Amino acid sequence: PPENIKKIAKIAKKYDLIVIADEIYADLIYENHEHLSIGSLENMKERTLTLNGFSKTYAMTGWRIGYIAGPQDIVTKMTEVRHALSINSCTFSQYGALAALEGPQEAVQKMKEEYDLRRKFCMKALDDIGFTYGDPGGAFYIYTNVTNSGLTASHFCKNLLQKTGVLLFPGTLFGDTEDKYIRLSYLQPIDKIEESMNRIKRFLKL
């Protein structure tokens, strides 16, 4: 939430910290949620490295192109390291990224609307199952608490895959130290999501 971003900025300025902000999902925000770029706040531009790319907003996963904005002295040093490793992004990816930025943006909005439909479908299905989750205000993932299944998240995912063929990832891969959460993605078409949810429901009744 913007209020938390402002608190982080206040701490960064107080203790003279550099902030690294991954804003890859900045354009995939839903309903009453709001994205605030920390580098846009007062006196934060000179202490913020903002990372972004094209894989999420423009569905260009595999083109392997992104960008960084930040203080010139830091970015210059980062560029030197980058040149020692891989020189530059391939030419067609650069042209593709330019076309994405300069071209019509209607497709981005349509994609976002479709993600939102899938998001709401998943939320309704999880409510029906009885799983709790954090409000997914952006991106295309839902972090879901599965403790009322009687299993740890790791065992839940393993058993679900073995018995139903549905692949989910436990939150332990993303910082969940209590093994209570799974990460559910709604990138797939709605019919596949519906089938997966039905399989999860049947799995819980076994």
Q: Each predicted region: which residue ranges?
A:
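PLP-dependent class I/II
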Residues: 1-206
